[in-house]
Design a protein with these regions (language model features):
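Non-transmembrane, interaction-prone segments in cytosolic or luminal domains
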Residues: 51-54, 60, 80, 214, ...
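Short beta-strand->loop
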Residues: 90-92, 118-121
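Mixed-charge interfacial surface used for oligomerization/domain docking
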Residues: 3-4, 12-33, 75, 85, ...
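Short beta-strand/turn micro-motifs composed of small residues
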Residues: 9, 90, 238
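Glycine-rich phosphate- or other oxyanion-binding loops that anchor nucleotides, phosphorylated ligands
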Residues: 56-101, 150, 157-160
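N-terminal glycine-rich anion-binding loop in soluble enzyme alpha/beta folds
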Residues: 6-71
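Intrinsic-disorder/low-complexity regions
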Residues: 80, 112-113
Length: 291
């Protein structure tokens, strides 16, 4: 039997801690800067991000996992087991330094060849879904080599599709992560752009008008039409202060559309700094062939 492959991801993946523990996923902290304080993502509630903005008028900024964050974890793993194998399924490399930090962390290390890095080209729950799917693949393929696992992960990441709709555009504008920020108009007009994660970038696509609960059903159908989502599992993204009408609408519509398993995942502090309160999102697996 091949040596067990250990999965590593950043806390920005929003993988719930109990799920990470169950699947054996090690989470590396990303960071949130509020004033002169730098806090580890996952150590405080995302509602604090919103409270800070309400109190100061400033949106907290984020930073990726550092070389030290990765190296300290990698060193600890290989001290316990020099033959360990690690597959780092990284937060989108075009949005943060985490992937590069991981590369530098293994540079000149004797265990370098026992670590593989895959850019998931996803953030938040998109990354969560991809990492969870890779964990399931590894369970079904216990004798897979590290290279085989990395190839499988790349395919899974390509099939994974994510979008979200922010309620308040101020966070997304301030965060500077949206690649076509000029498309971010509409707060006063009740226009809400759908942000899709495309090749690792946050891209503002179709705009929806009206209240979040009303447009949730329409977005689900549009997203399914575009990606031909597989029916075995769909993820919905819940953020601080999201309207419960959104949850009801998506649960009801997903059931009618034949989705067998519905999982709600709450965003952590990193993506809350960019998407803000009241947002919601959808993550699914495309049944279309991916280039």
């Amino acid at each position: 039997m091949a040596n067990e492959i250990i999965l590593v991801a950043e806390t920005g993946s929003d993988i719930p801690k109990d799920l990470a523990q169950k699947l054996g996923i090690i989470l590396i902290p990303m960071h949130v800067l509020m004033g002169d304080q730098t806090l580890d993502d996952g150590t405080f509630p995302p509602e604090d991000v919103c409270a800070y903005y309400d109190r100061t008028g400033k949106i907290p900024t984020t930073s990726g996992s550092t070389i030290y964050d990765f190296r300290s974890v990698y060193d600890q793993i290989f001290e316990k087991n020099p033959d360990a194998q690690i597959l780092h399924l990284a937060y989108s490399a075009v949005t943060t330094c985490s992937y590069h930090s991981s590369e530098l962390a293994i540079e000149n290390k004797v265990y370098k060849n026992n670590v593989r890095l895959v850019d998931t080209k996803h953030v938040s729950v998109g990354q969560c879904a991809a990492v969870s799917a890779v964990a399931a693949w590894l369970k079904d393929n216990p004798n897979a080599t590290l290279d085989e696992a990395a190839l499988a992960a790349e395919k899974i990441c390509k099939q994974t599709q994510m979008c979200f709709v922010p309620k308040n555009l101020d966070y997304l504008r301030a965060g500077g992560r949206c690649s076509n920020a000029t498309a971010l108009v509409g707060n006063l007009l009740q226009l809400h752009p759908c942000i899709e994660i495309i090749d690792g970038k946050l891209i503002a696509c179709k705009k929806y008008r009206g209240h979040m609960g009303k447009l949730a059903r329409t977005l689900l159908h549009d997203f399914d039409s575009k990606h031909a989502l597989q029916r075995d599992h769909i993820y919905f993204i819940v953020t601080p202060y999201m309207d419960e009408a959104v949850r009801t609408a998506l649960n009801d519509e997903a059931a009618l559309m034949g989705f067998q398993k519905i999982t709600w995942v709450k965003t952590g502090c990193v993506i809350t700094c960019h998407g803000g309160p009241g947002a919601f999102g959808i993550v699914g697996t495309s049944s279309k062939e991916q280039a």
